[in-house]
Swiss-Prot record:
Active site, renumbered: C88 (glycyl thioester intermediate)
Matching Pfam families: UQ_con
Catalyses which reaction(s): S-ubiquitinyl-[E1 ubiquitin-activating enzyme]-L-cysteine + [E2 ubiquitin-conjugating enzyme]-L-cysteine = [E1 ubiquitin-activating enzyme]-L-cysteine + S-ubiquitinyl-[E2 ubiquitin-conjugating enzyme]-L-cysteine
UniProt-recorded name of the protein: Ubiquitin-conjugating enzyme E2 2
Keywords: ATP-binding, Chromatin regulator, Cytoplasm, DNA damage, DNA repair, Nucleotide-binding, Nucleus, Sporulation, Transcription, Transcription regulation, Transferase, Ubl conjugation pathway
Family label: Belongs to the ubiquitin-conjugating enzyme family.
Disulfide bonds, paired cysteine numbers: none
Enzyme Commission designation: 2.3.2.23
The keyword DNA repair appears for this protein: yes
Originating organism: Aspergillus fumigatus (strain ATCC MYA-4609 / CBS 101355 / FGSC A1100 / Af293)
Length: 151
């Protein structure tokens, strides 16, 4: 069944293959273009450096008019990531635009890693450490980086 969402996702996939953004990758799971596996590499010169963080993206038939659900599969200690792995990111909610594609979503998440929004935290502990005890925050992040290699 060919829908506009599926056609758009195939275009997104083609772009990820031909012009991949640095430090991110994604592709549909076998036999289901509506579910994607993705990987974000922790940005250099950040506490997340060298981390390999796995995510899953779920698209509905309303895509690109409705944002996908995005969730970290890898453990993540970050002010804007819930314990469930779900993200609190404005472009996946009230600031969504149909012009965003998979590459834009993943690069936004990658940028969020080192530039969290502490005014609206999903993980209060991570947010408080980020603001008040950066050394401990970095230690906890580095622990998740090491765990990401085992996932």
């Amino acid at each position: 069944m060919s829908t506009s969402a599926r056609r758009r996702l195939m275009r997104d996939f083609k772009r990820m293959q031909t012009d991949p953004p640095a430090g991110v990758s994604a592709s549909p799971v076998a036999d289901n273009v509506m579910t994607w596996n993705a990987v974000i590499i922790g940005p250099a010169d950040t506490p997340f450096e060298d981390g390999t963080f796995r995510l899953v993206m779920h698209f509905e038939e309303q895509y690109p008019n409705k944002p996908p659900g995005v969730k970290f599969i890898s453990q993540m200690f970050h002010p804007n990531v819930y314990g469930t792995g779900e993200l609190c990111l404005d472009i996946l909610q009230n600031r969504w635009s149909p012009t965003y594609d998979v590459a834009a979503i993943l690069t936004s998440i990658q940028s969020l890693l080192n530039d969290p929004n502490t005014s609206s935290p999903a993980n209060v502990e991570a947010s408080n450490l980020y603001k008040d005890n950066r050394k401990e925050y970095i230690k906890r992040v580095r622990e998740t980086v090491e765990k990401s290699w085992e996932d």
